[in-house]
A protein has these predicted regions:
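A residue-level detector for short acidic-glycine micro-motifs
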Residues: 90, 112, 153-156, 174
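Short, basic/aromatic beta-hairpin or loop at an interaction surface
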Residues: 76-83, 140-152
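Compositionally biased, proline/threonine/alanine/serine-rich low-complexity intrinsically disordered stretches
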Residues: 1-39
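Surface-exposed, glycine-biased beta-strand/turn segments
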Residues: 29-137, 169
Length: 174
């Protein structure tokens, strides 16, 4: 579940180490197949139990500009320099306090878990704590072909998986 905080809406990133496969017509003309250069990429599902554009939103996209500038998937600026994930946010604090389930975006194996950090705004955490662990309570999953996803800023005590555990798409993580 996403953290309870009285400071600000949560950013709930599912930080991908590489961009997900774009939907594009295939050689056969069929829509929604991965482009050939990303054919081995897993198909990522939404990692939150919410409805995009209704009660959750993209806060930041993956930065596709290889240099010092920024460019999201649509050549826009909804990212920041060097960002390697897709950050999702909830509608408001009451929704966050009720809890929204964070789920695996694709099948894989849990490779890292951190739980126990307090549920506070990242702006309320000491700078040293942020430097050591900017993701707060988190789960990282390894997927096929070297892809990884990270689910950060989870509610303290909510993590339901352990290192080494296999997971399936849609399985609750925290």
């Amino acid at each position: 579940q996403v953290p309870a905080t009285a400071q600000e809406p949560a950013q709930v990133p599912a930080q991908e180490r590489a961009p997900s496969a774009p939907s594009a017509p295939s050689a056969s003309g069929a829509p929604n197949e991965p482009s050939p250069e990303l054919a081995g990429a897993p198909r990522f599902a939404l990692p939150l139990d919410c409805t995009p554009g209704d009660d959750c939103f993209v806060q930041n996209h993956f930065d596709r500009d290889p240099g010092p500038g920024t460019r999201d998937y649509a050549c826009g600026a909804l990212t920041y320099d060097g960002h390697t994930g897709t950050d999702l946010r909830l509608l408001d604090l009451p929704q966050m306090e009720r809890g929204v389930e964070v789920v695996a975006a694709a099948p894989g194996r849990v490779v890292a878990v951190h739980d126990g950090d307090p549920d506070v705004s990242m702006h309320a955490r000491p700078r040293e704590a942020l430097a050591r662990n900017p993701s707060g309570n988190a789960v990282r999953i390894a997927h096929a072909d070297g892809w990884e996803t990270q689910y950060s800023h989870l509610r303290r005590g909510s993590v339901r998986v352990r290192v080494g555990q296999p997971v399936v798409t849609g399985q609750p993580l925290g």
